[in-house]
């Protein structure tokens, strides 16, 4: 096999695709290089589908190797383990735009493996992985209606849209968006933003689609040089006689069942109709198997529901295309949590809780970009009971990780800075009922629970899921889609944001792309729905509570001179250990002089704060202090006025009259009130007792 390479310019980056040198036994393999990022994508496709298989078994695995940045993995085994959250999210990012481009009816197993071989810590390798996957599929011969292109977009007021920004570029960006699509249409969007307008978000999608054309053209040219012959595969012809039998015998009953608005009752009735069809059409000698009938029945269901929407009839639950389901909001329903909310929208329901912790509770991660500390976590749980099913319980699945990340993107932009609110925040969304858009219910619940916990959000956030039914003779954009509309429709378009703008946008297309008009309509309807939901939420709670929950840890933060850190710690940690033992508080010190104090109650944190103030305080001229005489000398007395700080009361400053001996007036251990006269350049403190008037002594309080 000969080696083929293709080099092209993609914005400011030079991209090289190579095949024929590495992983030659895979069905398709491409090494993509963008700057320092080198990602190997391999594709293997089974030549035939497993007997009786009724789904497309596509799996995508993105894996980061520590050697890619010259590191040895941590831990006892010193090798990579289970996929990180970043690897899981990127695997989903690659999967979503390629899945709709395999032809309907293709059931052969396909596995994509993307391995980051080399990169630098300022670059995300996901775009290289997506381009490598696109190229590997396009040259593999597997039926695939690509290629796709992919691009990351940043945005700021000075530069406008920025193509494929690095991590450092994204630090000042108002947008982080990844877009994938074909030559003609957009297939996938994943983004988080700082309250951008609908026009700015749509502009970013269109900008990315325009810029990715260079990559799509290059992959097409690359495939022309080295692609394997396309597999001789054709979809199995539809069984017309079975379709006709179902249409004539059961279409009316299916349509009647879809008039039932309550989900479980509707499913039960559809089950009755399906069982009747199977019983009537499947016989031992018959030409139809049970799998044939149930498969054709599902296709008829889909066709009926979609046709109803296109024809302008009411949706499954009786709504029109723009109406949001009834909303119910409760906060503070769980007594011992720091913040809680119950958000219900139709038959979708989430209980969100907010827990406040210390900086020691923050999430530590160690990836290719190095170690990082995350003080905000949002975890999404989707138990099987939420859809009335029995199911596997245990570890977190890819879907839960993806939905949790989307909900996190939705609220990230409104979080206070650590300086404003130095707590670690963990939000957990428990989906207790699901019938569409549970991730957007999690956004609403997260916003509500944090406000209930006293987290000073910049603004409340709400989310909504939009859907699409598109046929040759028209299309309809649906607001607040049900689970069935998601399953039977062509688009899942989720938007989260505040009253001012969008904070997260996710789009997945199940057909071969949509155009600008559809996206514009979807964004417009989403704005209307989001505004409505925010109004409903504001009826219950519109701002953060003025105080954090009494169940939350008490926290105080002060800034001290970094030179004073050693004084707070003390010899061998004696001072800080003493403060902790006396007050019960925990203390964290940063190199920049930031001191964080955590305690179970305010009294403990205040006591620790006072002690640190005393240790780090500087003597102020003309200020009164109550001190203790620590040593006597012929020329005066040394008085301790602050922890670790002694000053001298000269014999002439002890009393108005002339005294013969210091011991006539003072003794060691005696408490006295003194005034600071001066602090010289070497830090020596001059004190006076005689300059303190009787009135000042009487008025002085510690």
UniProtKB/Swiss-Prot annotation:
Top enzyme class: transferase
Requisite cofactors: Mg(2+)
Record InterPro entries: ExoRNase_PH_dom1 (IPR001247), ExoRNase_PH_dom2 (IPR015847), ExoRNase_PH_dom2_sf (IPR036345), KH_dom (IPR004087), KH_dom_type_1 (IPR004088), KH_dom_type_1_sf (IPR036612), NA-bd_OB-fold (IPR012340), PNPase (IPR012162)
Residues where Mg(2+) binds: 486, 492
Keyword entries, A-Z: Cytoplasm, Magnesium, Metal-binding, Nucleotidyltransferase, RNA-binding, Transferase
Ranges where the S1 motif domain occurs: 622-690
Residues covered by the KH domain: 553-612
Subunit structure: Component of the RNA degradosome, which is a multiprotein complex involved in RNA processing and mRNA degradation.
EC number: 2.7.7.8
Record's protein name: Polyribonucleotide nucleotidyltransferase
A Pfam family it matches: KH_1
Family that this chain belongs to: Belongs to the polyribonucleotide nucleotidyltransferase family.
Any single GO CC term annotated in Swiss-Prot or TrEMBL for this entry: cytosol
Gene3D superfamilies: GHMP Kinase, N-terminal domain, K Homology domain, type 1, Nucleic acid-binding proteins
